[in-house]
Amino acid sequence: MEGRNPRRWWILIVLCLSTLVLVVDSMALTVAVPSMTEDLKATAQDTQWILDSYILVFAGLLLTSGSLGDRFGRRKIMIIGLLLFGAASLAATVCTNPGEVIASRVAMGVGGALIMPSTLSILITVFEEDERGKAMAAWGSVSMLGLVGSPVLGGVLIDHFSWHSIFFINVPVVVLAITAALVLMPESRGPWQKADPLGAVLSAVGMTALIWWIIEIPKHGAFGGTSLVSLAVAVVALGGFVVWENVVAEPMVPLVLFKQRNFSGGSLSLTLVQIGNGGLLLVLTQYLQFVLDYSPVKAGLAFVPMAVAALIGNGAGAGLTAKIGFRPLVLVGMGLMAGSFVLLSTVDADTGFTVPAVALALLGLGAGLAMPAAVGALMGEIPPEKAGVGSALNDTIQQAGTALGIAILGSLLASGYADKMPAGSSEPARQSIVGALAEAGAKDDAGLAHAAREAFTSAMSTTLTVSAAGVLAAALLAAVVLRNRKPGAAEAPEAPKEDIAELAV
C-alpha cells in the first residue's frame, strides 16, 4: 500500500519507550514506598498523597491533553510531556521532604497526561488499519512487560541504591525517547478548530473529583464525609460537561461516538475488565510476600508466567484479528481472564505457587488476546482527525475502571480480612496482615501468624470472585453489543464515520 511511513516500526519503538517510562515509574514506586517513608519520615497521609497525587492529575487532564494533541500536534504535545516528566523525575531525586516529592509527582502527572493519549493517537495515524493490530499488540506487550518487570526493577534498585534511583531511571529513557521522536517521528494533527475552554475545565474538575471520590471510598465509604462532596462535584461537573459538549458548536470531545455500538460497548467492557483487574497486583503481591513469604524481587518474578503468556496472546491475536475479526478474540480472551480469577479464588494459605502460576498464565493469555482487540474495536470507530481525544477517552475509561477496581477490591479485602480474624485480636492485627505478622513475630506467636494468613486468603478468595464476576460481565456485554469487524473491512454502522467527523469538527 502506497503512503505507508517507512519509519513506522521505528516510530513504534519510540511510542513504546514513551509508554514504558510511565508504566515502570508507577509500578516501581510502590516497591520504594517503605524506604521512602522511612527516609523522609513521612506520615501515612504523606505516603497516600505521594501515590495519589499523580493519578489525580493524570486522570483529570487526559481528555484536555488529547484535545491539545489534535489541535497543536501530537508529537509536539508528547515531547512537551516527556520533557516535563523527565524534569520532574530529576527533581524528585533531590527531594528532602514529602512535600517536595508530592510536588514532583504532580508535575509528573501533568507530563504523563500529555504523553499517554499522544502515543496511541500517533500509532493510529502512522499505521494503516491492516497493520494496526500488530502495532497495538506490540505496544500492549511492552506495557505488560513494564507492569510485570517494574516491581523486580524497583526491588533491585532499592537493594543496591536508594529510593531516589526509582525516579532517576526515568531520565535516560526520557532523553532517548525525545531524541528518537525528534529524528524519526512526523508531526500529525487534526483540522484546526476553536478551543473549548469550558469543556476542558469541566472535564478536568469532573474527572479529578471522580477519581478522588473513588480513592476516598475505603476511608469514608461511598457517601460519607468528604466522599459525598467529591461525588457531588463529579456529578455536577461531568453532567455539565456532557450537556455543554452536546450544545457547543465545536466540542472538545465528540460524544456522538458513543452512538457507535463498538465504541460504547467497548468502552463499558474495558471499564468492567479494569474494575476486575484493578486490585490484582495489590492482592497477589501481598499473598506472595506475606503468605508465601517471598522477597519483593521474587514476588515480582512470580508474574513472569503472566508476561510470557501475554506476549503469546498478543502475537497470536494480532494475526487472528485479520482472519476472524475483533469480537471472537474479545470473547475468548475475557472468558480466559474470568476463568483465571475463578482459579485464583480457590487459593488458600497452603496452596503454594503452582495454582497461582497457572492462573496468571491464563490471565496473561486472555489479556493478550482480548485487550488489544477491544481497544482496536473501540479506536476503529474514531475518525483520524480526532485520534488524540479518542485515545484520551480510552485512557480515561481504563484509568477510572482501574481506580474503581482498586477501591472496591481493596475495601473487600480489608473488611473480609478483619471479619475473619479471631475474636480478641488486637486492632493492628485486625487492620492488616502486615500488622498481624509483625505482632506475631514480636510475641513469637505462630498461631496468630497462621490465623492471619488464613484470614487473608479467605478474604482474597471473595475479592477475586468479585473480579471474576466483573470480567465475566464484560465478556457478556461484549457478546451482546460488539459487532464483529476485521481490520480494514467496511462496516455498516448506525452513524457513518463521515457524519461523526462532521459533527465532531
Predicted regions and their residues:
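Transmembrane core module of solute transporters
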Residues: 8-58, 62, 162, 172, ...
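Membrane interfacial helix motifs at helix-loop boundaries and amphipathic/re-entrant anchors
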Residues: 28, 32-49, 91-103, 154-167, ...
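C-terminal membrane-cytosol helix-exit motif in multi-pass small-molecule transporters
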Residues: 172-188, 206-215, 234-247, 474-482
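Hydrophobic alpha-helical segments of secondary membrane carriers
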Residues: 138-142, 269, 393-397
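Hydrophobic transmembrane architecture of multi-pass small-molecule transporters
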Residues: 176, 376-377, 381, 393-483, ...
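Transmembrane-helix bundle of Major Facilitator Superfamily
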Residues: 1-183, 316-317, 324-328, 335-338, ...
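Conserved aromatic/hydrophobic "specificity hotspots" at molecular recognition or selectivity sites
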Residues: 159, 163-202, 246-249, 259, ...
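Short helix-capping/hinge motifs at transmembrane helix termini and TM-loop junctions
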Residues: 95-97, 128, 184-187, 218-219, ...
